UniProtKB/Swiss-Prot annotation:
Plays a role in the ciliary Hedgehog (Hh) signaling. SUPFAM superfamilies: EF-hand (SSF47473). GO terms for molecular function: calcium ion binding. Residues 98-133, 134-169, 394-429 form the EF-hand domain. Signal peptide: none annotated. GO terms for biological process: positive regulation of protein localization to ciliary membrane. This is EF-hand calcium-binding domain-containing protein 7. Residues 1-24, 176-234 are annotated as: Disordered. It comes from Xenopus laevis (African clawed frog).
């Protein structure tokens, strides 16, 4: 960001995020279902791998994409041996298909007189000599389409309509082919399963080795016993049943030290953000302890509601902290916040001199993609009697809350470091020192930091730069977790407090990123340390670790064998539960000599009893 005019406007494109109604498939489930249908037009199973660049091109084309050689080379390098279905889905999320408007815009650059058609001779010369050149036969195949060509001219409006209609028909045929066997549809692991009201989201690629299992496996008849699919033959099986009771009746609660007011204290804010692919990113922190001391630290959601008795909707999101110690370039698990008191999760223990990582964590059971519903778009700006642009009260309220979230130290001002976390989230770029000086010259500041009013002025300038077009403002809002009704549905702000008895702790936010690999490793270690271990019947090389506290159950699987295994996980007998996987039945691929998080499970209704009843079966 080199100048103030670009300060608020460098926002990356983000698809509209909206809430959902319960009976509908959610956005992520639809994405995986469509992706899988396209994959199965080329491969027999979604467990088959892409082994050549030509296969990658073909399967991408089945999704309506037409990847250039540059795009193909980005994902299929000289070192690439194969890509799996998860890799394929990741590519689809990065390489969006062209829209009809984009294609029409490209044609209109050629049709400078806006006639609605292009002469074959002109189009032939462009397509065979410019960019990635098409062959003569490829161009002629377009010209042979009778419904869009006449008298040596291509009607590009008709061509675009035909092209996208054909893409839709191909996707529909692929989906119908995948679902043609109604019995197999009941067994689709990793896709939407009907009649399961306790599920509200789809699987996330962030869970390590998750594979979407195919309906080509043998079918399962509906069975309400504690061991479903008893007619099926498994290599091994086991079940875990835990009656959890009512969450509010916990036996061990988080208790503050009596003399906490005499301890040294520091605090900071942060936020979980839900990505389009279901991943969750958050601020990461470094904690410096200068003297061996007893430390008490907590994390809880940040309530921004101004209405007494009506807390912010994200207050039900579970939050925890994992404490890691820097050790010769590694980060070793120290502990995590295990005890709770209402929304607050905390830990008390002794920390030695050194630098520690504090990594916020949420299970993903409650912060998750929502299903779509039609909602009225809020108005962001309007023109007053003098025709000047003005921010609406609703938008100003949302911006004020946003300011409170990114004001990490809570001093009512935004430092350059705090503002840059906001910029990295919304535009992917940082504000350099020169641009920050320009910012301070144009917007209200105090002590070299941006005030709340200055933040409002900055967003108003963005609206003026676009002559009232709110598109860029919506990108900012959506990347910060807001929907079109100005409700924050895909983010959860939180506050962290650190108290040390003998020294002044130093706490600093150092990054805003996904922590899948580091955090998944810490979760696995914590569950292995504190959970119950149980080997699978008839296959003791697979151990299932189950950890429970008052708020959730976490399951971790370890494969000690030298072979890759496919496991079915069945939650159909759970009561009042919601899984981080978003499904009642799914399959996972467990690599040789590996440990992975299977799932997190929480109560759907915290005021009622809940029961964790999970059956795991080795399929192969």
């Amino acid at each position: 960001m080199a100048n103030h005019s670009s300060l608020p406007s460098q926002k990356y494109a983000a698809s509209e995020r909206q809430e959902y109604q319960k009976p509908q498939q959610n956005e992520e489930e639809i994405f995986y279902s469509v992706s899988r249908a396209a994959y199965l037009t080329v491969f027999k199973s979604s467990l088959d791998n892409i082994t050549t660049k030509d296969q990658l091109q073909l399967v991408l084309q089945q999704t309506g994409r037409n990847p250039s050689n540059r795009v193909l080379n980005k994902y299929w390098t000289p070192r690439t041996k194969e890509l799996n279905f998860d890799d394929f889905c990741a590519i689809l999320k990065k390489e969006k298909p062209a829209t009809k408007n984009e294609l029409l815009k490209a044609f209109r650059k050629i049709d400078t007189n806006n006639k609605g058609y292009i002469l074959h001779n002109d189009l032939y010369e462009i397509l065979t000599t410019k960019g990635e050149k098409m062959s003569q036969e490829e161009v002629n195949s377009v010209f042979r389409l009778a419904e869009v060509n006449s008298n040596g001219k291509l009607d590009y409006n008709k061509f675009c309509s035909t092209f996208f209609k054909t893409c839709e028909q191909c996707a529909k045929v692929a989906s119908e082919r995948m679902d043609s066997n109604s019995k197999a549809k009941r067994q689709q692991f990793g896709s939407y399963i009907e009649k399961s009201p306790e599920r509200s989201s789809s699987p996330k690629s962030s869970h390590g080795n998750l594979k979407l299992f195919d309906s080509e496996t043998s079918t399962r008849k509906e069975n309400k016993s504690s061991r479903p699919s008893s007619a099926r033959s498994y290599k091994a099986t086991m079940s875990t049943v835990i009656n959890m009771g009512i969450p509010g009746t916990r036996t061990a609660k988080l208790i503050e030290p009596n003399n906490l007011k005499d301890w040294h204290t520091t605090s900071t804010k942060g936020c979980f953000f839900l990505e389009d692919n279901g991943d969750i990113i958050s601020h990461h922190y470094k904690l410096q302890v200068s003297e061996k001391s007893t430390v008490y630290l907590t994390i809880k959601p940040l309530n921004l509601s101004k209405v007494e008795g009506k807390p912010s909707p994200w207050m039900s999101v579970d939050t925890s902290l994992f404490i890691l110690k820097e050790n010769n370039g590694r980060a070793d698990l120290v502990s995590f916040t295990e005890l709770r008191n209402q929304e607050t999760s905390g830990w008390k223990g002794e920390l030695g001199v050194g630098v520690y990582w504090l990594i916020p964590f949420t299970t993903g059971c409650r912060l998750r993609k929502k299903k779509k519903q039609t909602i009225k778009e809020a108005r962001l700006v309007y023109r007053d009697g003098n025709e000047d642009l003005v921010l609406t009260p609703e938008f100003k309220s949302a911006l004020s809350d946003m300011f409170d979230i990114i004001d990490l130290d809570g001093n009512g001002l935004l430092s350059l470091a705090e503002y840059n976390f906001f910029e990295m989230r919304t535009s992917g770029e940082k504000c350099d020192l020169d641009a920050w000086e320009v910012c301070k010259e144009n917007f209200e500041t105090k002590k070299n930091e941006l005030t709340r009013q200055g933040f409002m002025e900055l967003n108003l300038m963005e609206a003026n730069d676009r002559e009232g077009d709110p598109s860029d403002l919506w990108v900012t809002l959506q990347t910060m977790g807001y929907n079109k009704a100005l409700e924050m549905t895909e983010a959860c702000p939180f506050v962290i407090e650190v108290h040390a008895e003998k020294c002044s702790p130093r706490l600093k936010a150092v990054s805003l990123e996904s922590s899948n690999k580091q955090l998944q490793g810490a979760v696995c270690k914590s569950v292995k340390l504190k959970g119950d271990a149980k080997p699978m019947d008839r296959y003791e090389d697979v151990i299932v670790y189950t950890y429970k506290n008052d708020t959730h159950v976490t399951s971790v699987m370890e494969n000690k064998s030298d072979e890759k295994l496919i496991l079915q996980v069945n939650n159909e007998q759970c009561k009042n539960c919601i899984s981080s996987r978003g499904l009642q039945v799914f399959a996972v691929e467990l690599l040789p000599k590996s440990v992975m998080v299977c799932q997190h499970v929480m109560p759907l209704n915290e005021k009622q009893e809940w029961m964790y009843n999970c059956v795991q079966n080795i399929l192969s």
